[in-house]
Amino acid sequence: MNSMNQMNKDSNSINITGLTDEEVRQRVEEGFTNRTDISTDKTTKEIVVSNVFTYFNLIFLVITILLIMVGSFRNLTFLPIIIGNTVIGIVQEIRAKKTLEKMSLLNAPHADVIRNGSVKQISTDELVKDDVILLTAGKQICADAVVISGNIQVNESLLTGEADEVEKTEGSTLMSGSFVVSGECYARLEKVGNESYISKLSLEAKSMGGKEQSEMIRSINLIVKWVGIVIIPIGLILFWQSHFVNGESITKSVTSTVAAIIGMIPEGLYLLTTVALALSTMKLARKKVLLHDMKSIETLARVDVLCVDKTGTITEPDMKLKEIFLCKNSGADGTQTALTLDEIKSLILDYANASVDNNATMLALKAYAAEALTNNTSALHRTAVSQQAFSSSLKYGSVTFSDGTYLLGAPEFIMHEDFARIEEEIIPYADKGDRVLLFARYDGENVENGINGSVTPLGFVALANPIRANAVKTFEYFKSQGVSIKVISGDNPRTVSRIAIQAGIESAESFVDAATLDTEDKIADAVNKYTVFGRVTPKQKKQLVKALQAKGHTVAMTGDGVNDILAMKDADCSVAMASGSEAAAQAAQVVLLDSDFAHMPDVVYEGRRVVNNIQRSASLFLVKNIFSLLLSLFSVILMVTYPLEPAQVSLISMFTIGVPGFLLALEQNKDRIKGHFITNVMLKALPGGLTDVIAVGALVVCGEVFCISDASIGTIATLVLSVVGFMILFKISEPLNGMKYAVIIGNIAGLVFSGFFLKKLFALTDLSNICILLMIVFGFAAESLFRNLTLLVEKLRGSYEKKKGFNV
């Protein structure tokens, strides 16, 4: 409330009244609002359309019509599964969408707007053209505007790629999408909604190809793409061969071809992925974690280096002034300043009252100043002539009074080569983890361009920043999961190191002053050598992230301020605290809405659970696809009719792939993700797929030799494939537990029940003694073949990895 009153006072002092309610209403009617037509989220209609009108659903529709035309109704058993898959996919996506929309409202950007002569806070999409808004540090500029009063430093790197801060004064143009680094100004909106720069840029980016996909989604799309390409020509060849070469009836030719096509379609893979990700999104939302980007779940699961800022991440976001003390070596000759401690305190409190900054440090000083005023302390009697907001690159701010200019900031950056003179006075506080700022008098000009005059250190401000209660436990988790921590902060490296040690971060005693890392080569060497980086500029944070990525690491960056945005933008995954700057929260892929860093293990765990389980279940689906593709090629080469019917394929898929695959996707899994998704999935599926095709291929040959009927061969093949399917399920489910045993036993029971009581529905026939004997022999042979093929693939993979020196 006090800050809002201050805003009202400031706006009145420079006679800014803003728009009236009538003027706002008129602009809304004319369509000059800040709402855009660009959305990265699907509408409910788009979700339904994307799930119903798919390429594979079109194929299923065609083969359904063909089966109805030839009267093969029992082979439509796949239809309820396809319809169920589609409905479940739609329902879960819509549920996830509604959950995310509710959570997004909590993180929606707001603006301080001047209307009817007073300041009010509204959502940015409620702004209209010609509105006057107040911009302060940490705010993202929500529409194109022009500065009408004040002075700010703006970072336009998200738009232009240039990391340097740009000064904006009265008359300067502000581009939407940039963010305020420091200072304060009033700006009038000129282009809003679809007409703003960021909207046009977003529209152009959307038309050029949409969002980047995660490795898992790219891999699944690649698999589906190639299956989609080969499925039609193979299907046509199989039908031609069966009907025109082998002389089979239309009904037999259609059903055998449909069986091959159904086997090649990974119909449950997309559904499995969609549902698993949707459930994870909703689960994290209940823990106050908002995902701006779905791929961030997978990326965080693959992270092996986590970069964290100190304030707001390791420590609580709020700071408290601990002590103000005199500088003992104020003069060049080592003498103490002539000013008394009370006089220094008075100056510092006047500085705090005049400062335009609202960061954690200045809020602590302003709280102290407010308390001093309440206690009638002799302070707050100087009027500022000018102010320079704190700069993340310069590491200090300034206020000029009638009697001179005063600086407050990092001692090293204010004193430069004279820092050694006062360093010993700071060390005892830094060793306790306190943030220590230097208050100094400046005798020079143009302090905004750097210090070029004499500086007289007067005193120090020590601020306490308590460690989060759960920080130690959180960092212990990351250590146990093989995730390295890098602490990247703008504070004194000794202070940051001490805080990191208290938080239990491994090797936190290894620290470096980033001011000494003045080349990219030095930064590249430092990322391996040090854990704590102090006095880091925003540009250096970005360079450190890139250096880690260049060494093959998957990097996540957490932060809460505008000085973290550059690094967050280039990190593989970015995480922001909602209590920090609005710009950081909007730029991040993951937002911790309650700003509790202890939720990070939940996000990493959820990502690992989802990716590992999808990877495992995807292997089950691909076994069927590999088998069906290779068996189709086998049938074409040997000029035999495809031996299975669609109903038999549906039976095998239901109990050895579909149901267990979905249940296993909900299993707990904390394992770190290794290797590439498509490689892992293919290598796990290959032994099973090869076993299936060799077993069924040999069975077809035996059937020809011993004149066994096609119906009996189909039944034997179904049972043998089921045996192999459960062997694969056992292998993929390792290590087994009670839940996994229950899933496997339940599906075996379901298959046995269907085999005995639903034989006609699934095209199963009674077997003669020779057929039963053949089934037993092939069952044992398939078990041995699968076991040895699995060992062979694992051995070949191990040899390749050993040779290359990395995980495939």
Task: Kindly give the residue locations of the regions a language model identified.
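Cytosolic catalytic regions of ATP/NTP-dependent phosphoryl-transfer enzymes
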Residues: 178, 302-457, 463, 476-477, ...
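Helix-interface capping motifs at the ends of transmembrane segments in multi-pass membrane proteins
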Residues: 58-80, 229-265, 278, 282-288, ...
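Cytosolic catalytic regions of P-type ion-transporting ATPases
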Residues: 5-8, 18, 64, 77, ...
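Actuator/coupling domain of P-type ATPases
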Residues: 12-18, 22-39, 87, 95-105, ...
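Transmembrane helix-loop-helix hairpins at the membrane interface
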Residues: 34-112, 119, 226, 365
